[in-house]
Structures are given as structure tokens and as C-alpha cells.
From Swiss-Prot:
PROSITE patterns: CHH_MIH_GIH. One of its GO terms (molecular function) is neuropeptide hormone activity. GO terms for cellular component: extracellular region. The modification Leucine amide is found at L127. The keyword Secreted applies. GO terms for biological process: circadian rhythm; neuropeptide signaling pathway. Its main location: secreted. Keywords: Amidation, Cleavage on pair of basic residues, Disulfide bond, Hormone, Neuropeptide, Secreted, Signal. This is Ion transport peptide.
Length: 130
């Protein structure tokens, strides 16, 4: 009887670290699953800029050649300008008329990019050619 009790105690003592390890592994697995689901959700989001970029190109009356990198660079200027001033309409005003609005030039000035204006004008011409 004493031997049986001793075996039972040893078994319980051996199970305690196993239970602790199981809980830790369960926590790690849960964290991995949560992170994986968040990453996949973010990657397939319909608000993904790459998904909307070409549509936006036509929405703002661009009639030239769609160049993803040029469009993204010019759009980034408008995003940065919006982030600087936090005016609700500024992003769309900056992009209007395929980046040919006075707001775009104002954003270049505000972001201290006016010395690169000629380069940006060439980019605008590529996107906005008729």
C-alpha cells in the first residue's frame, strides 16, 4: 500500500511540470494563431492601397499611363500633407485633377519638397497626359 501511494505521488509530481508545459505551449500556439490571422486579414484587406490604386488613378481623372510607383509617390505626398494638417478634404483636394491642383503644389511647399517640384511635375505629366 505504501509503495502504491509513493508511486502515485511520483506520478503527480511528474504531471505538474507536464501540465505547466502544456499550458505554456497552448498559450504559444494561441498567440501564433492570433498573429497569423491578423496578418492574413491585413494582407487581404479590401482597403489595401495596392487594391485601390488603379481605381483611384481613374477616379481622379488621370488619363495618362498608369505607373504604380509614380502614383504611389505622388499619393504619398498628399497623405503626408493630410497627416500634417489633418484637414478632412485635403487628401482628395491634393490629388484632384490628377495631382494638378494648386493644393498639390501647396503640399509640396508645406512638406519642404518645392526644390523637387520639377521632378514631381514630370511625374504628374506621365500620369495625366491626354
Amino acid at each position: 500500500m505504501h509503495h502504491q501511494k509513493q508511486q502515485q505521488q511520483q506520478k503527480q509530481q511528474g504531471e505538474a511540470p507536464c501540465r505547466h508545459l502544456q499550458w505554456r505551449l497552448s498559450g504559444v500556439v494561441l498567440c501564433v494563431l492570433v498573429v497569423a490571422s491578423l496578418v492574413s486579414t491585413a494582407a487581404s484587406s479590401p482597403l489595401d492601397p495596392h487594391h485601390l490604386a488603379k481605381r483611384s488613378f481613374f477616379d481622379i481623372q488621370c488619363k495618362g499611363v498608369y505607373d504604380k510607383s509614380i502614383f504611389a509617390r505622388l499619393d504619398r505626398i498628399c497623405e503626408d500633407c493630410y497627416n500634417l494638417f489633418r484637414e478632412p478634404q485635403l487628401h482628395s483636394l491634393c490629388r484632384s485633377d490628377c495631382f494638378k491642383s494648386p493644393y498639390f503644389k501647396g503640399c509640396l511647399q508645406a512638406l519642404l519638397l518645392i526644390d523637387e517640384e520639377e521632378k514631381f511635375n514630370q511625374m504628374v505629366e506621365i500620369l495625366g497626359k491626354k
